[in-house]
C-alpha cells in the first residue's frame, strides 16, 4: 500500500497521482474531493492507471476525459440534487435559499438543484469554504433579507455548522436542509 495526499486540491492531487504512478501502482483509490479527483484523472488516465473514488460526486466527473479508467461508488450530485428537490418539496419549501461552496462539489450540486427545482429560488449564494474565507453571518443575512422560507446547504460539516449557527442566532425560523457533505463522524 502506497499512500499519497491529495490535500483536496487538484494540483496537489495530480502531483500525488504522478508520484504513485512513478512508484509503480496498478490502481489508485481516491481521491475523496471532486476537485482533487479531477486533477488526479488528468495524470492517471493518460498513464492507463485506473482510479476508483468513494466520495467524489461532481456531475462533471461523469463526462471526464478518463479513457474509461475512472470509477466511483457513489452517485453523481446530479442524482442527489433531484433527491434534495424532493426533500425540499416534502418539507413544504416554496422559496428556498441555496448556499453552496464554490468548489466542484458545491457548485455542481447547487447548479443541479436550481435546475431541478420547479419553483423559484429566493437567493443563491456561493462561498469559499476555506476557514476564514467566508462570513457565515452575511450568508445567513442573505437568507433572511431574501424572505426565504428554507435554506439548502451544499456545505461541509464545519462551514455548514457555522452557517446554521448564524441562521439560528439571526432568528431564522425556516427549514434547513443539508446535502451529504454536512455529514460528520463526530
PLM regions and their residue ranges:
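Short, solvent-exposed loop/beta-turn-alpha elements that line the ligand-binding surface or hinge
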Residues: 64
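Beta-strand segments within the central parallel beta-sheet cores of soluble alpha/beta enzyme folds
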Residues: 1-2, 123-124, 177
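Short, mixed-charge, low-aromatic patches
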Residues: 37-46, 67-70, 171-178
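Beta-alpha junction/loop-to-helix N-cap segments that form part of ligand/metal-binding clefts
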Residues: 1-61, 73, 127-136, 159-161
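Venus flytrap/periplasmic-binding-protein-like
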Residues: 59, 170-186
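Short, flexible micro-motifs
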Residues: 33, 38, 109, 181-184
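Extracellular/periplasmic Venus flytrap/periplasmic-binding protein
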Residues: 15, 59-60, 68-171
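Periplasmic-binding protein-like
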Residues: 20-32, 50-54, 95-100, 147-157, ...
Amino acid at each position: 500500500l502506497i499512500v499519497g495526499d491529495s490535500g483536496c486540491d487538484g494540483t496537489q492531487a495530480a502531483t500525488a497521482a504522478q508520484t504513485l504512478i512513478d512508484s509503480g501502482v496498478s490502481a489508485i483509490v481516491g481521491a475523496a474531493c471532486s476537485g482533487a479527483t479531477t486533477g488526479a484523472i488528468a495524470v492517471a488516465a493518460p498513464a492507463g492507471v485506473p482510479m476508483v473514488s468513494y466520495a467524489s460526486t461532481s456531475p462533471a466527473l461523469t463526462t471526464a476525459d478518463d479513457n474509461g479508467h475512472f470509477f466511483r461508488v457513489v452517485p453523481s450530485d446530479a442524482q442527489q440534487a433531484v433527491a434534495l428537490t424532493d426533500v425540499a418539496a416534502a418539507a413544504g419549501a416554496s422559496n428556498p435559499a441555496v448556499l453552496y461552496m464554490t468548489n466542484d462539489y458545491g457548485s455542481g450540486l447547487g447548479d443541479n438543484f436550481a435546475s431541478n427545482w420547479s419553483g423559484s429560488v429566493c437567493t443563491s449564494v456561493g462561498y469559499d469554504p476555506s476557514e476564514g474565507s467566508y462570513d457565515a453571518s452575511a450568508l445567513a443575512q442573505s437568507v433572511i433579507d431574501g424572505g426565504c422560507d428554507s435554506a439548502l446547504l451544499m456545505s461541509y460539516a464545519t462551514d455548514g455548522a457555522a452557517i446554521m449557527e448564524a441562521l439560528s442566532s439571526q432568528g431564522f425560523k425556516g427549514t434547513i436542509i443539508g446535502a451529504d457533505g454536512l455529514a460528520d463522524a463526530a
